[in-house]
């Protein structure tokens, strides 16, 4: 069986839900950017058409060129529920690590909830620091009928965020990236029994 054909089933869809049906007060809300009314995250996900589900795309890249060459971490979720992961670190002569797996609909649904709950679709990167010699990070998301593409410098800590011209917006991206990286490292680690850097 190839890596592409492998499917990760972390839990049933009912176990993946953050909110319980018994307590509607726990439902998180996200502002629908296409209209002025506020909808729950679940309502927004329920209104997705099949084409919008197929068009969902998320890509994150962080990297720099330094003493060891071009070092980077990149992952993306593509149509067909594919997760592609690449980690290029030349430290101690390590080689490029590339992995590809298929994830369940429940995992993709949770990623969409994380995106909606973060509020990243409402942000703008015009006041964020430009990529520089420290490095570069990019976040691209296609979700429903919206497409965002952000580019900024590599951010090491919340201190870097606080020093920026848009600390609130950059903080949204910082925390979203931390959540996504934890999820991706867990998925890759669980599946391949490796320790992603």
Curated annotation (Swiss-Prot):
Key words of the record: Nucleus
UniProt cross-references to InterPro entries, sorted A to Z: Mago_nashi, Mago_nashi_sf
UniProt xrefs under Gene3D superfamilies: Mago nashi
Biased composition annotated in UniProt, kind: Basic and acidic residues: 1-10
Domain of life: Eukaryota
GO cellular component, one term: cytoplasm
Pfam families recorded: Mago_nashi
Single biological process term from Gene Ontology: RNA splicing
Cross-referenced CDD domains: Mago_nashi (cd11295)
Region (Disordered), start-end ranges: 1-43
Sequence similarity: Belongs to the mago nashi family.
Protein's name according to its UniProt entry: Protein mago nashi homolog
Organism: Dictyostelium discoideum
